[in-house]
């Protein structure tokens, strides 16, 4: 169950967390799959996650592009229309968390598409366009974070000498919170 922004606490029977309404949830296993909201929890804020804003543009299918049967990928993407509408995009705004739809982002999406398909006419006015804004959660190396959640204090103590000896053989298991797992950093490859 989604609890919103919350921290989790060790309990003799497992883990406890409270949602924003004060409801308490207890479990022996905790799976954290809350994308960029992991940066608000004290136990996971140190993980190498970043927020990237993206906006798609919804455009009426043209006579030419209405027959598109496969996705066209370029610096953006243009899939076949659904119910007469193309959903193209998307913008890429690191550290931008504003969820307001922007006409400038529609212009960016259309410009990328017009550059990739110069012989096709696209709308130049953005007033009739709509779109969708969402926040992606990525990692600094763009590989997802999957598995047990490391215990930061124990992790830093265990691997402190790696700062000075980067090639040192690691002969210890990573100290983790038992029963707490994470799935994050999927970026644009997330499941919705």
Regions found by a protein language model. Give the residues of each.
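Hydrophobic/aromatic beta-strand patches that form the interior of the parallel beta-sheet core
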Residues: 1, 31, 181-183
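A conserved short coil-to-beta-strand element within the FAD-binding core of flavoproteins
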Residues: 1-16
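A structural signal for short hydrophobic beta-strand segments in well-ordered beta-sheet cores
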Residues: 6-8, 77-80, 146
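Central helical "cap/lid" subdomain
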Residues: 18-72, 99-106, 119-124
């Amino acid at each position: 169950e989604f609890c919103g922004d919350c921290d989790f606490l060790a309990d003799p029977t497992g883990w406890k967390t409270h949602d924003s309404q004060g409801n308490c949830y207890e479990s022996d296993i905790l799976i954290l799959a809350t994308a960029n909201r992991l940066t608000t929890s004290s136990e996971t804020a140190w993980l190498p996650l970043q927020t990237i804003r993206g906006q798609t543009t919804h455009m009426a299918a043209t006579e030419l592009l209405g027959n598109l049967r496969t996705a066209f990928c370029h610096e953006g993407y243009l899939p076949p229309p659904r119910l007469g509408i193309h959903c193209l995009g998307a913008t890429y705004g690191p550290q931008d968390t504003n969820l307001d739809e922007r006409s400038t982002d529609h212009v960016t999406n259309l410009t990328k598409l017009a550059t990739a398909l110069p012989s096709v006419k696209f709308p130049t006015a953005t007033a009739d366009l709509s779109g969708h804004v969402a926040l992606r959660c990525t990692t600094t190396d763009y590989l997802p974070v999957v598995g047990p959640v490391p215990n930061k204090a124990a992790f830093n103590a265990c691997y402190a000498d790696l700062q000075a000896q980067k090639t040192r053989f690691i002969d210890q298991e990573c100290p983790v919170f038992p029963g707490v797992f994470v799935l994050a950093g999927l970026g644009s490859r997330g499941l919705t």
